[in-house]
């Protein structure tokens, strides 16, 4: 219609018939040309838009199907790798290589000398007692470097009292050992040579050489058929593998894929040690039981500590975010007394129930935190066990008090989890993912412990997990700054265990890493390392009175 009106108006301007015909032809040609160009551009625009949508849909499908790229990485893989590298370099500087050809040139507890500085007949409660240690080898020669793994402790058996001592290494063969005299009475002093520096260096080198000292065996179930295959953090095989990846956090676990079964058929796992060592025969001599934990202060008589009428410093109530010194406290009559804050005693069921009322508590970690569940179930009769079904002792464990709206849940951490007992992997997750699933509020508390199961593996695996947990806590605090997060450090463990894989030296290094990575986070610290030295338990799973005091510290943080 518009075209006809336009043509009619143009023709009235040209009365000549021939001119009008020519003009009419040119007008039609022009109109068709415009329509052609318009339709071509429209087609081109439509194609580009549709193509853009198709490509984007393809990318989304790719991400969800193959998980090549994390959707919202909290920290780039590159940044994490740089942090791991930086921490590793610092540790390598602290633990330099100390090769030796004979045990005689390593540190000797017998030939080393310890001297009390400024000795007195009596000491005042609260004083600091200092000891200078000069180390020598088995030939009596002064050593010119440090790096020995020492454990200092003061104790009074009659009072059931104990505390850690602080060791300062001057890196020249001399050490300062400092004790804070926390209580009155006769006090004995102990300084153990756990490993000489040469043994420490050997452990550090051996630890970081491979993941193959532990064998993981996975159970795949498909209808009536069960198949066991080898699994691990790394696998050196040409067989087809199932890859269980967490791309965001750069965590990986692998299993040899059984024939005619999907990777999702993996249901359970068990582990055992492999007969392999990265220590030489000469190095192994340092880890015979008779050479581990040798007393360096055998001939010291107990010292006498008196009150001296010294006034005690007024301490603030224990709260999350406080910096914990070392030693962080001491034991007296089996009770743990903190050195940096004022504790509330939770000795009665009513006190504990009042504290826990309306609380959601998530325990994430290993069996040393699982002990809390068992203790609370015995100590607080109103907490009832909720059966999650499933097999084995390492399934998710829940205690409920419906009347008081209390929930306490324990879940094991993700790989590596080292145990001969068969455990389910279907309810398993890495701790950062578990933290991401907690909404959080002022009545929510999370307790995390990590370490014992990481000791047989290269340290970079532990560092990566700790960094990922730190990032998850930061995300939690962004959505819920009132949520309370508490870190329980590792317990000391049995000296008789395979030192190459389970030595407390590995736990000590992991303790340093945890404190470094979490230093700026507003979290509470339960220094189980310090506690178990003070109690002298030498057991990865200490007795109930130690667990009671760990839980008591936790209750002080959340109430």
Swiss-Prot record:
Residue ranges crossing the lipid bilayer per the database entry: 17-37
Keywords from the named record: Membrane, Transmembrane, Transmembrane helix
Top-level taxon of the source organism: Eukaryota
Gene of this entry: NXPE2
The name this protein goes by in its record: NXPE family member 2
Protein's UniProt keywords contain Transmembrane: yes
Family per similarity comment: Belongs to the NXPE family.
Membrane topology label: Single-pass membrane protein
Gene Ontology CC annotations of this record: membrane
Localization (cell): Membrane
């Amino acid at each position: 219609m518009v075209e006809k009106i336009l043509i009619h108006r143009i023709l009235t301007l040209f009365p000549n018939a021939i001119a009008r015909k020519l003009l009419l032809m040119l007008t039609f040609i022009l109109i068709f040309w415009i329509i052609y160009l318009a339709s071509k551009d429209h087609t081109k625009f439509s194609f580009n838009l549709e193509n853009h949508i198709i490509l984007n849909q393809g990318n989304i499908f790719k991400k969800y199907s193959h998980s090549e790229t994390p959707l919202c990485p909290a920290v780039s893989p590159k940044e994490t790798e740089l942090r791991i590298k930086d921490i590793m370099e610092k540790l390598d500087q602290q633990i330099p290589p100390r090769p030796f050809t004979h045990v005689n040139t390593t540190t000797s507890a017998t030939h080393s000398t310890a001297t009390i500085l400024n000795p007195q007949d009596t000491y005042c409660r609260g004083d600091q007692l200092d000891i200078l240690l000069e180390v020598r080898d088995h030939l009596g020669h002064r050593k010119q470097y440090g790096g020995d793994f020492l454990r200092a402790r003061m104790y009074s058996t009659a009072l059931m009292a104990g505390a850690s001592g602080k060791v300062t290494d001057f890196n020249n063969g001399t050490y300062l050992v400092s004790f804070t005299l926390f209580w009155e009475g006769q006090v004995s002093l102990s300084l153990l040579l756990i490993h000489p520096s040469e043994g420490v260096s050997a452990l550090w080198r051996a630890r970081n050489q491979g993941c193959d000292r532990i064998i993981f065996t996975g159970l795949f179930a498909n209808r009536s058929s069960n198949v066991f295959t080898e699994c691990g953090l790394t696998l050196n095989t040409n067989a087809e593998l199932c890859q269980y990846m967490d791309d965001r956090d750069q965590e990986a676990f692998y299993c040899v894929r059984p024939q005619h079964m999907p990777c999702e058929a993996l249901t359970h796992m068990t582990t055992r040690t492999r007969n392999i060592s990265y220590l030489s025969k000469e190095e192994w001599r340092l880890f015979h039981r008779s050479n581990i934990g040798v007393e360096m202060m055998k001939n010291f008589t107990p010292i006498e500590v008196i009150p001296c009428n010294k006034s005690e410093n007024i301490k603030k109530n224990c709260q999350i975010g406080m910096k914990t010194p070392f030693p962080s406290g001491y034991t007296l009559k089996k009770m743990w007394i903190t050195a940096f804050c004022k504790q509330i005693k939770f000795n009665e069921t009513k006190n504990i129930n009042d504290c826990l009322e309306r609380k959601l508590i998530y325990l994430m970690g290993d069996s040393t935190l699982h002990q809390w569940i068992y203790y609370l179930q015995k100590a607080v009769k109103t907490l009832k066990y909720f059966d999650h079904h499933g097999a084995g002792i390492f399934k998710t464990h829940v205690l409920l008090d419906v009347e008081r709206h209390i929930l306490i849940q324990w879940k094991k951490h993700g790989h590596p989890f080292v145990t001969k007992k068969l455990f389910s992997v279907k309810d398993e997750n890495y701790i950062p993912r578990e933290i991401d699933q907690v909404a959080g509020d002022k009545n929510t508390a999370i307790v995390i412990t990590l370490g014992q199961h990481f000791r047989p593996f290269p340290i970079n695996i532990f560092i990566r997990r700790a960094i990922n947990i730190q990032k998850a806590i930061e995300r939690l605090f962004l959505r819920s700054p009132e949520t309370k997060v508490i870190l329980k450090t590792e317990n000391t463990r049995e000296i008789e265990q395979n030192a190459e894989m389970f030595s407390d030296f590995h736990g000590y290094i992991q303790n340093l890493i945890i404190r470094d990575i979490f230093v700026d986070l507003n979290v509470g610290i339960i220094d189980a390392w310090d506690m178990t030295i003070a109690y002298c338990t030498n057991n990865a799973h200490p007795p109930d009175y130690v667990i009671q005091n760990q839980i008591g510290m936790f209750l002080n943080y959340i109430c």
